[in-house]
Amino acid sequence: MVAVIKTGHSIHRIFNYNENKVAEGVASIIGAENYPLDTENLSLKMKLCLQERHLALNTNVSRNSVHISLNFAPSEEGLGKDTLKEIATKYMREIGFGEQPFLVYQHFDSGHPHLHIVTNNIRNDGSRIDLHHLGIRKSEPARKSIEKEYNFVRAEDQKRQRYIALPV
């Protein structure tokens, strides 16, 4: 499993990227954690509004949006929606984002299974979650723990491959 963390200035851009993929039929939303309603009962506006409310708690933070992709080896195709959601939730908890509102999208637009997670780094009390060295200090141990628990191909054992987008 390979985890990629990108931070940004615009939750709208990250959110719209994923929702546009859903509209194109190459992704689906499989989870909305720490939201007041179940995923299927959330409108587009409701999904984005909770993220925006968090950001309003601390307007001094410029890099406040977090876009994470969890990428699995092609041989791990066929993971069920519930398993993928469980993996995303464990990963977020282990990197210190378990209490944050986050959206989980399953994408089908490449030659390997992968998830996208949309969240922010502003806590309910307005303090920010430090993103400095998040990859090394939190993401790497979380990734390795999940690889071991689910018996996934270790990122270190995978050869770098070019993934070719599949026609839809």
Regions found by a protein language model. Give the residues of each.
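N-terminal nicking endonuclease/strand-transfer module with a His-rich metal-binding environment
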Residues: 1-168
